[in-house]
């Protein structure tokens, strides 16, 4: 399957395809994945081609359909820094040590290694930008067992638990470990 998957940095010209991707996620997946607004305007004006974000897409090489999307924000929200401080982790956005990560793959393409491919490309880019740690954007829902297993398989470490619209885990990955 990996032979027919193309991984690349998303561009402004991919905005329509990313909006279509998001519209094709199941409602269950949308409940678990909503790091930002998925309108064409928001993607074009605030996310794509913005130096504060790294966006990676996975496309079906044959149909050119976006089947996976990962966005990394190159700074951490203040309220997240406060929560992470409770785990003994001091995050300072001026040091550019931490980025946050939110991936998703269309339901019928999950469990094929696409998420790992998105993560690998993200890590490579963030490493070149001298980032050291990758945390989950908004954590991961505790009931999302498949995602929790994915992160653990990919060497994320469980750091703590918080409540926001239900239980969530905070996890962290050393990018160059």
Give the ranges of each region predicted by the language model:
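A short beta-loop-alpha structural element at the N-terminal edge
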Residues: 4-20
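Active-site rim helix/loop that mediates acceptor-substrate recognition in acyltransferases
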Residues: 32-61
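Conserved acyl-donor/pantetheine-binding loop and adjacent beta-alpha core of acyl/acetyltransferases
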Residues: 63-102
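A short, internal acetyl-CoA/4′-phosphopantetheine-binding micro-motif in the GNAT/acyltransferase core
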Residues: 88-91, 100-111, 139-141
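Conserved GNAT acetyl-CoA-binding A-motif
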Residues: 97, 126-140
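Conserved beta-strand-loop-alpha-helix junction that forms the acyl-donor binding cleft
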Residues: 110, 135-147, 164-168
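Conserved acetyl-CoA-binding loop-helix of GNAT-fold acetyltransferases
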Residues: 111-124, 149, 153
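C-terminal "cap" of GNAT-fold acetyltransferases
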Residues: 148, 153, 159-177
